[in-house]
Structures are given as C-alpha cells and as structure tokens.
UniProtKB/Swiss-Prot annotation:
Gene source species: Geobacter sulfurreducens (strain ATCC 51573 / DSM 12127 / PCA)
Protein name: tRNA pseudouridine synthase A
Role, per record: Formation of pseudouridine at positions 38, 39 and 40 in the anticodon stem and loop of transfer RNAs.
Active-site residues from the entry: D52 (nucleophile)
Substrates-to-products reaction catalysed: uridine(38/39/40) in tRNA = pseudouridine(38/39/40) in tRNA
Subunit structure: Homodimer.
Alphabetically ordered keywords of this record: Isomerase, tRNA processing
Keyword Isomerase: yes
Amino acid sequence: MRTIKLILEYDGTNYAGWQLQPNGLSIQEVVEGALARLLKEPVRLRASGRTDAGVHARGMVAAFDTDRSIPLRAFSDGLNALLPPDIAVRSADEALPGFNPRFAATGKHYRYTIHRGERRSPLVRLQSWHVRGALNLAAMREAARHLTGERDFASFRTAGCAARTTIRRVDAVEISDDGEMLTVDVHGSGFLRNMVRIMVGTLVEVGRGKLTPEHVAQMVVCPGVVPAGPTAPPQGLCLQKVRF
C-alpha cells in the first residue's frame, strides 16, 4: 500500500468549501471523483484542514492510500487532465504509510488580500476584499502585534466553532502595502474557524479608526468578553502553505 501526498491549488469561488457537503459541491468531492476515475477505485482524501466556501488555496495538502503502481508524475498529470480549470495538482509525492496531513501539520500560512482602489475592480473581485477609503497602516500594524504569541482567541472565532480549546499560537501577522493592494500574512500553529478572517476584519476597523490597537489588546486579555470586529469576506483569503 502506498500513501500519496498531493499539494493542491484552487479557486474556491464556485465551491461550498473543501469538505464534503450534503448540499453543495465541494472541492474534496471533485478531487476524489477525479482520483476515482484515474485509479478505477474509490478514494477518500485526508486533508490538512478545510477551507470555507469562497476561500482559495495555493498549498492545500491532502493524502490518500492506493495499491496502484503508477508513476508519481501520472498522478499529477492524470488528475490535472481530469480536474476543472479552477482546481489543480501542484505536486504528487510519496509519503510515509498512513500519513495524515491534519495531524502531521505543525503550522499554516494564510494570506488575506485587500483591494484599496478608489473603484472596485472586476479583475480582482474574486480574490480580494474591496475596502474603500484610507486605512491607517501604522495603527493596523500596532494592533497586529497584540495578536502574536500564544493567546486565547475566543473573541476571534465564529459561533459554530466546536474547538475544544481556544488557545492558539500566532507566530506573525505581517501587513504589506503594494499601492492599491494590501496583504495580511498570518503564520501560526493552527487556527479557529474564521479566526483569520475575523482578525483581518478587526484590523480593518482599526485602520478605519473605528477601533484602537488598545481595544485589540483587550480582546486577547479578556477573551470572549471584549468583542472582535466583523468577519472579512471569504474571497480575500488564501491558504498559502502548510508546514510539517
């Protein structure tokens, strides 16, 4: 039995997220369907996590087991021939038997993209959040510093989050300015549901002057008591890389 590790890139616009859904087409369903056609057998993927509807990925990691002896290149080339244009296999490699990306992962890197143009852009609307008006980047960066380290992020999760603990370690929150485009890179050991999007929505409120960096500091000092800002929309978020 072989275990194959895939690195997947996808545009999540037209999907109900990564995970199989009773109502709605998921990325997992599409990739498993392509694998079943390629290998002539049913396949169940083990993923490094899940992305919500509309969220993208450049480095989703998934693994599966198979007895087939086809070359690695045939996995990537064969799948890419069967997958739709908005999903692609970036690489296929042998992994240790039974490798499970979810439990083996030691960290993730997410990137959130904000479009700050005076007018909305049809060309970037599916990969960014259009935020009108000036943003105070110095205040946003000061607020971001309060979100690094091992902290209780109870204020930064969606109501449906079922995580047993809200303690997470965030290694870095980096805000980069490239003219009309602003990127927020978040590196950490793991994240609560919608945590990165709530962090970004909160930082934008700081940039608009509606919240202060000190208010953000209180969100992790008094978790679940001091409310966070709004949840940024899904289309600006992309899973860049999973660390092992």
